[in-house]
């Protein structure tokens, strides 16, 4: 049995963090004399106190015996021996003692598993045991040492000093006086040759043992093992001189430890002392074995060491390789991270931006792919001659919109003329929802226009999350490839970089920046599309790009921005970037920009982008009764001609005029009624269905749903307008009268604008000043009347309004009573306060009379509610 003498029991505990830091020393034996403590402290620090010293011990020193060695006898060091190699860095050998170095017993390549950056002085042995696998051979360090030494070898192991970075350990032993160290080494090597040991972490390489013939230095400096060694030649004493060993001598000394790749001597003209040489092994483990066995070895004179001998001092020489580059990159994040961000941006601009511009051009020119193809043109002619199908031509009007376009032909002509002019301003087509804005622009005014692109703001604004918004915006213009999913990952990288270097690295881009990239690439593609005509027209070759764009407004593409300011209250980032980009297109003569919007406040954001311009505006309203009738009749005539439905008799359409008058001239409502008539309903039945549907939407949106913080109106305010509009003779209310009413005295104009934005009402202005309030669309007046016919709902909403008025009067009376109390507390009643007191009393009297009146109405309404079932 091998008797292992523990080196941990009486050793000091050195607690340290990584690198050079101040240390705390706690002695395992509390009975040391103070003088001995001072000696130990001075020896370990090697400098005046306080000082900063490197950590000199790799193993933490709170002692725990290895659990695997249940049959091993432990001994204690004396206090004089407790700090032997901890303070000096050397293992002292006495008579009949020897030292071996065993390699490949620790996973040197897996140190990150054993010891992380926050591990401090955590025990390597404990870490090895946590990843230990006893079921495999040679999985435990102490078992390996037991198996290395033959059982018949009469030696006693006294101490094991691990060298984890080098994957090995020093084994100190005692031997009988009649046994030679060389014989012990030979016996151990013979045993390993017959019984090779392969650890679990490196099953392809065997454990090797060599005798230590030098005086190794046990250090814990940040010197990583390397296959390249620097061998310095030192004299054995200050007055002696060292020999410059030649290559043959170095080869003879170091070749037993492994394959040598190269030996490089110090240049002869170098003045650096002491002299040195580089010995490079084929593997780091050979270099580690040579360093630990040969460090401190004195080369005698007969072997070329000079008259007094030459002492070898060996250390690792780091090679310039990928690991060093990696270490440098990881240790300089303030430089590396911004450089990586810049490289990423450069790659994006160099590689992806031209691709994205190309795909955007395809999107802009997609409508002309068949028209510009000669083969497709020939096929179209042949098909037309055969009268089989009209490929590429418009046939009859399936929706019956001809009557509406005839009524709005003036607006269409005006819009087309604006596109031929060189005016640096926006074109705005404004109208309520369902008024046919998109159809008028795309299907009529731009039907024969060459290049156009449509951006639907509703799809972008309704997307959830920045990544979805970016993806929607990119799909609108054909911007690809787009890596919207990378934005979240880049945000985490930026957050980590901010924690490391204190500032963001710029990997992630905000929604604002991403949209700017998309619109900028789109502007580049639009400009290239326009300038393509310049090659065909040589007479303008002398003009610059800007002059050519200004001289040919008819060649510019058209950008149609639909649903502008849709749901703008949630976020304005999308609209801010679109407006800014559109202003750049217009000012740079790159494209014509047409905004389609239902929001009456469109002028405010557009004026910020073009502050000195007057917008070209087309306002679409509801069509007249005559046009509406013609639209419905044309729609029904087309369906009957197509054979889808039977023609309707005149008596079935006798009530059509009255129904259209009730429904109003909104195109979507007229089209819905026509579809219901096609399905077999009478005009009156179709209108009643539309009214019921509108009434349900009113109840859901304005009266019955719980009020939210974002909502700018109350149920009582919405009901007040609904009831007043239903009772009005001409369906209109005075704007000023509503603003001065009790329910709208506070922020009344803001509330009315919010209700207009929600399409409950519409506000008509004269010379820019609000004048009248009407329903949001004509059919809503009939829906308002239907809602007010519900006695239970009407009584409940009126009761809520009366309750609100009573509470308001009670608050007013409370304020008046406080003022009267204050005036009554005066020691004398000045004559000047008589009128004020009388005025306050009159206000209290008036408010009390109102409360009495409201309470009578409240009692009546409560009676109605109780009678309703």
Curated annotation (Swiss-Prot):
Intracellular or extracellular location(s): Mitochondrion inner membrane
Source organism, top-level taxon: Eukaryota
TM annotation in the entry: 335-355
SUPFAM superfamilies: RNA-binding domain, RBD
Location, primary (coarse class): mitochondrion
Protein's membrane topology: Single-pass membrane protein
Signal peptide: none
Family statement drawn from the similarity comment of this UniProt entry: Belongs to the YME2 family.
Protein name: Mitochondrial escape protein 2
Organism: Neosartorya fischeri (strain ATCC 1020 / DSM 3700 / CBS 544.65 / FGSC A1164 / JCM 1740 / NRRL 181 / WB 181)
Encoding gene (name): yme2
